From Swiss-Prot:
It comes from Bacillus cereus (strain ATCC 14579 / DSM 31 / CCUG 7414 / JCM 2152 / NBRC 15305 / NCIMB 9373 / NCTC 2599 / NRRL B-3711). Catalyzes the reversible phosphorolytic breakdown of the N-glycosidic bond in the beta-(deoxy)ribonucleoside molecules, with the formation of the corresponding free purine bases and pentose-1-phosphate. CDD domains: PNP_EcPNPI-like (cd09006). It comes from the Bacteria. Belongs to the PNP/UDP phosphorylase family. The record marks R217 as: Important for catalytic activity. InterPro entries: DeoD-type, Nucleoside_phosphorylase_CS, Nucleoside_phosphorylase_d, Nucleoside_phosphorylase_sf. Its EC number is 2.4.2.1. GO terms for cellular component: cytosol. One of its GO terms (biological process) is purine nucleoside catabolic process. This is Purine nucleoside phosphorylase DeoD-type. The active site is at D204 (proton donor). A purine D-ribonucleoside binds at H4, E162, E179, M180, E181, S203, D204.
């Protein structure tokens, strides 16, 4: 048991999916996994373990933003020995040719968070995905005939931003989309020597206004989830 996770040792698999929304964790467990058990309900942040295609896998809600995901990733790695962590979530497109419902696999993440600047004063640490996980996820997506993009994303600390000028400039430099957690996940994975990946579905476009409903975000992004699960069970 850790501070925010009440699981006993052995109840969490070495490979885990990390949705921000605990209701999405429940949806993934009920829709994709077999022989499911719920190991966590602390603060309503649900966690489940089951099997997918005969392989053991867990799914844990993390909440939104760098501080929240950092809590769960730290505890999953240090207290429960998790080795493969795959964030599954939504993002807002920045590039004109990135469309709603496209799948983005984050190769790396830039950020306006001070998390890494506190650890590396005067430096900008460049957190990156694990290549093996990335390739497996990319191959799984292309085999399904999906439009999968691989590249840089922005991990933002601010959801309601007063000006989008900096986001537009990052788009000019090739950043694909904006979300709120990947930098933290990749940095902590690097710190502890484990594998991490973010697989994201585009829920809206920052500049065109195209978007999906909140219900669709919870229940219909099955392709993203399948890609992540297929990558997880190959590790």
């Amino acid at each position: 048991m850790s501070v925010h996770i009440e699981a006993k040792q052995g109840e969490i698999a070495e490979s885990i999916l990390l949705p921000g929304d605990p209701l999405r964790a429940k949806y993934i467990a009920e829709t994709f996994l077999e022989d499911v058990t719920c190991y966590n309900n602390v603060r309503g942040m649900l966690g489940f373990t089951g099997t997918y295609k005969g392989k053991r896998v867990s799914v844990q809600g993390t909440g939104m933003g760098v501080p929240s995901i950092s809590i769960y990733v730290n505890e999953l790695i240090q207290s429960y020995g998790v080795k493969n962590l795959i964030r599954v979530g939504t993002c807002g497109a920045i590039q004109k040719d990135v469309k709603v419902r496209d799948v983005i696999i984050a190769m790396t993440a830039c950020t306006d968070s001070n998390m890494n600047r506190l650890t590396f004063p005067g430096f900008d640490f460049a957190p990156a995905a694990n290549f093996d996980l990335l390739k497996k996820a990319y191959d799984a997506g292309t085999e399904k005939g999906l439009h999968v993009r691989v590249g840089n994303v922005l991990t933002a600390d601010v959801f309601y931003r007063e000006s989008m000028d900096i986001v537009k400039k990052l788009g000019d430099y090739g950043v694909l989309a904006v979300e709120m957690e990947t930098t933290a996940l990749y940095t902590l994975a690097a710190k502890y020597g484990v594998n991490a990946l973010s697989v994201l579905t585009v829920s809206d476009h920052i500049f065109t206004g195209e978007e999906t409903t909140s219900e669709e975000r919870q229940t219909t992004f099955n392709e993203m989830i399948e890609i992540a699960l297929d990558a997880a069970i190959q590790q």
